[in-house]
Amino acid sequence: MTREKFIDFTKDHIIYLDGATGSNLVKAGMPSGVCPEQWILEHREVMLQLQKEYVQAGTNILYAPTFTANRVKLAEYHLEKNMSSMIHDLVAISKEAAADTPGHPVYVAGDITMTGEQLRPMGKMELEDLIAIYKEQILCLVDAGADLLVVETMMSLAETRAALIAAKEVCDLPVIATLTFEADGRTLFGTDAKTAAVVLESLGASAIGANCSTGPAQMEGIISDMVSVTTIPIIAKPNAGLPFLDENGTTCYNMEAEEFTEEMQVLVNAGATILGGCCGTTPEFIRQIHDRFGTETRVTAARRPEGIRYLTSERITHSFGLDDGFFVVGERINPTGKKALQAQLREGNFEKVIQFAEEQEACGAKVLDINMGMSGIDEKLCMLRALEEVSGVTNLPLSLDSSYVEVLEAALRNYPGRALVNSVSLETEKFEKLLPIVAKYGAMFILLPLSDAGLPKDIEEKKEIIHKIYDRALSLGMRKEDIVVDGLVATVGANPKAALETLETIRYCKSNGFATICGLSNISFAMPERGFVNTAFLTLAIQAGLTMAIANPSQEMLMSCALATDLLLNKEEAALRYIEYAGGVKERREEKEAELSRKLALLEQQGTKAAPTGNTEVSSAVTAPKDTPQINEMQEKLKTAVLKGNRNGIVKITNEALESGEKPVELLNQVLLPAINLVGEYFDQGKYFLPQLIASAEAMKNSIEVLEPLLQTGNSGEEMPVVVIATVEGDIHDIGKNLVALMLKNHGFHVIDLGKDVPQAKILETAKENHAEFIALSALMTTTMQRMREIVAAAKQEGITAKIIIGGAVITQEYADEIGADGYSKDAADAVKLAKSLME
């Protein structure tokens, strides 16, 4: 199947997927702990019959049972060498079932999911290794005859991108992708539905959507959000409600086919046009939704508005149109002219990069430009490190800025959002090499109207260059909305008409539907009091239609002027933005005054008087003598390192704190523990997501490793409470379990982590040998949660007094109560609170 054929196939009527595979195989006798693909091949008729029933029920796209048939997952069963033959035989089952069609077209989708290994910086997996793993599986699926590919049940947008990139590089099959969202409308890694939809459509997915986690009604908001920012078909593949265990310990779901079908109407109304079922659904579910919606044409829901552009990080989307409010692309993460930043980058230190990112976001930037162009460093490696560090402290979308195509390609490949590329000109190398790369990764780009001949001699030549690049972009599948034209600002000191020419370019671009950008500082080069010139020019440019500018958002006069101009032009919500910014200006001034007072007081303590200079700031060079206690300042610095997840810098900060006279026990109890507790609160409130939680926990762990020898030297002999933690037998998921272990360690527990797929006997034996106060159990699958019941019962029978706490995606408080566990934890932060409460 070609992508064009897929578009034609899905354009008029609702399309039907199949329902659950795993829960039906369990009913048919598949035990937990086995390799699902191997069991299917050993019980071929069971799978064939199930898929034939789906086809008879009305399925148009049948998922081949290759869900975890990748090298990493199969290696857990020592079957990785059999991957190719296994995939070939598994796809053959689905092809045979699809051939038994009752008269409607049926296509077989090669099924792909997460590997279970996490990408850097949260895990150890490198992006290129992950892409290679997916390529191996995809090539096997293509060779086996899959008609299309499905990437499903994804919790990570970055890993979903890796799968799409792999597919794009080895085949031309259409790829559909669905992610799994939590109750808060975000994936486990913090991506919302709009952001996922924008990124995956721009990367070339033929259809996108959601599967698993919830029943149909709870999926409505996710589907609506995806529909509102895309033009491709939207998939809805919900569970049959919520799981529970019946009196026999069998996993069941709380929705019957009739109720499920009724609720699916909500998703159809929201704009879903490809329907199916996930956990707990059967061929009868598919039959009923097919009977309900089979002859209906697609519901026309509100799709992506005309002319709206989208830039994203991994976690948020910034949308804008030509008549929306002006915004700033922060320019400060650029070593040009910044000696301190250059020195840090040569040392591999990214503290100032992080500082500039945080400051620019606080000052109102909506996008951050990242430029690592300088001598004496590996620019590509520094760019990738900067992306990692900046993405860890801000959710703002990024602009990728380099003179080298290979640097931009590496950045686009690794960046897990939709970036802005700065920039593409008509210069031969960038035009011929860079533009196809931008198109491949679905980015937006700044169109710089330069050619090999240099600057255009007049506005007409500038227009000609713009349209040449635009035409080439269209031929690569891009749209006008993917382009931001640079107005090419020259200095008014050398060319008195420079401002007028740029303003004419801006007006021309807006009238022709192009977004625009410019670098403000060029206009005032070599002029006195440059800020006045920049601000006046910005006012004129916004009135002419300027969309955004690359500038320093910490310049209050410039930012205030921009927001006031929007206000006077009566742009939507301009008054609210102006009032909000003005309030922030007041707060920042008060903070500066307080900082001034604090530093003056510190100097006076040493008998040094410093008179105010008329400014509200004191140079950062003004510090107290080295022998001055800096307890408050050092504590705040260490706390910030935990809150920001500064894994690399916190060791240095901890050592500095110790050298300044801080006591290890006070750093632990008064700084680190309160900081990580605050991180947990932010996570509970939805301010932080899994990446920030992991980064902060690892930062704290690195700090504790410095303190631990000093703490042990002077401790009172009090033993730490022992926790034996494991993912139960048959379950190979450990993301959540690993984080719980890390958080418990950070709070002073002695954690014995047994890993994943751990037999009951080993868990109980370890608990007895180590006199554990707690046994912590994790399960992600409904097929393995029964192991928890068995462990609780066995522990009581053997007289083990350790308190048993449980958690995992399918676990609830009700289930914990039912099996007699001592507690249930919904996440890592909650696990710490639970353990402490059970010790009281």
Which residue ranges define each predicted feature?
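Domain-level signal for soluble alpha/beta catalytic cores
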Residues: 1-484, 490-840
